[in-house]
């Protein structure tokens, strides 16, 4: 039977060992820093696609853009910390912001797709990683 040993870099292991009981609060701070970067990119992409390329005059109210936000960091069932960029529900007219965002992202019959989430995800990936790394380094230095 084959055996494989994976070793983490020493400097990373030292950072993690310094966190000890403060890990949860540090994870929240780091995820918040990364989430803010992605949220900013999603907001700019959303504002650039709303009302663009329509056959009729746009009826946008700004409610979808105003409902975009960042969830608090939570622990999922696998024990991992998560943070989500999403839309607050429901709309003032009783509709769903997620439904409207889905129609914008993927289109529907007679309405072409205007992706804003997927391009934001790919464009902000490295910037998000950098922001989270910087936030982790700052939190470790505080300890």
Please state what every model-predicted region is:
Residues 1-84, 92-93, 98-143:
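Short, Lys/Arg-rich flexible segments
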């Amino acid at each position: 039977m084959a055996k494989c040993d994976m070793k983490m870099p020493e400097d990373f292991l030292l950072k993690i060992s310094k966190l000890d009981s403060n890990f949860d609060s540090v994870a929240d701070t780091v995820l918040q820093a990364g989430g803010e970067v992605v949220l900013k990119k999603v907001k700019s992409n959303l504002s650039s696609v709303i009302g663009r390329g329509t056959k009729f005059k746009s009826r946008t109210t700004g409610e979808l853009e105003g409902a975009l936000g960042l969830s608090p960091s939570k622990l999922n069932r696998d024990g991992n910390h998560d943070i989500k960029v999403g839309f607050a529900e429901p709309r003032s007219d009783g509709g769903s912001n997620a439904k409207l965002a889905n129609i914008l992202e993927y289109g529907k019959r007679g309405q072409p797709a205007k992706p804003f989430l997927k391009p934001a995800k790919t464009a902000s990936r490295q910037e998000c990683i950098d922001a989270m790394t910087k936030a982790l380094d700052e939190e470790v230095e505080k300890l």
